[in-house]
Structures are given as C-alpha cells and as structure tokens.
Curated annotation (Swiss-Prot):
It is an enzyme of class 2 (transferase). ATP binds at residues 10-17. GO terms for molecular function: ATP binding; dTMP kinase activity. It catalyses: dTMP + ATP = dTDP + ADP. This is Thymidylate kinase. NCBIfam families: DTMP_kinase. Keywords: ATP-binding, Kinase, Nucleotide biosynthesis, Nucleotide-binding, Transferase. Signal peptide: none annotated. GO terms for biological process: dTDP biosynthetic process; dTTP biosynthetic process; dUDP biosynthetic process. SUPFAM superfamilies: P-loop containing nucleoside triphosphate hydrolases.
Amino acid sequence: MRGKFITFEGIDGAGKSTHIDWVADRLRARSDIAGVVTTREPGGTSLGEDLRQILLHRKMHLETEALLMFAARREHIAEVIAPALERGKWVISDRFTDATFAYQGGGRGLATERLEVLEDWVQGGLQPDLTLLFDVPLETASERLAGARAPDRFESESRAFFQRTRDEYLRRAAQSPQRFRVIDATRSIADIRDELEKIIATI
C-alpha cells in the first residue's frame, strides 16, 4: 500500500518546523504505518542541499530561482519521496511545491502559468495527501525571526514580499480545502499540537 505524503507550509517565522518531529513521532507510534521519513525543501538530497545553499545565499534572476527550486524538487522526488511512498512509508516534507507558488509566484510575481508547467513536468500527478499551513500575521513572524541567526536571502525580504507570499498561501488553501488545513500558529505549542493530533488521527 502506498504511503501518505504530508507537507508543512508557512512563511518564515510561522513556526512550522517546531512541530515536524513531533508529528513524525506521533505517526511512528501507530502500528498501521510502515515508517516515517522527514525531509525538507529545498534540500532532502545531497544535490538538493547544495542547491539549497545557492538558493538561500546567492543573488539570481527570479526565473533562475524558480528553475533551481524545481531542479532540486525533481531530485528530491526521484531519490527520496517517491521511493519511500512506494515502500509504504509516510513522508513529511518541510515545504513542497506550494512554497514555490507562494514565494516565487506570490512573493516574486512570477506567472502562475509558468510554475504550473514546471509542476506538471517535474511532479506528474504527485500531490501531497495533506498540507498543514501554519499561518501567522507578519508582525508575529517578524518578532519570532528577530534576534535569530543571520537571515538568509529570503528572510531578508521586505514586508510587502511576505504579505504577498502569505496571501498566496491562503489563496491556495482556499482553492484546495480538501488538502489544506490552515493552522492558527499564533497559539501556544500545546494548543497547536492538540489540533494536529486531531488532524493526523483522520488520515
């Protein structure tokens, strides 16, 4: 039986990464699951991690950025995601294609139609079974990022960029309510995990 594919999404500072290992551990405790793989984008493979460093720290044209994102994703799918799903394992990815539509599409303004062509070519019919969108106002995200490590190229973007990115995430969630669950990530970790527990119990 094919495994399930779960993605975590949200703007920088939304707090999604705090919950990935917790959800993975909850799923590993279930007797009906063959195993759980946690991964991330960009990254997840040796080549993907090299591309991640370029994407996070090197200036480039916006179309180059999108193409590199999908190049890393193709490798990620071929080497990690698809094989794990075929073996019946569940895969949890910190970001996937929704992030590209939000950041490169919403944030950068790259045409959705171009991204859809790349999505179809790179992924075929592969889509997450569940996408958890951790949503916070920009003020909350900024407060959480303040004083953290030196910001990368994306974290250094303008407030307007992140507003467009957040708006695109929410637009995609509204378009695909059967796949998305929008999490109010301004709440306490305990409250968020109570909600996550209920969500993962249904899949």
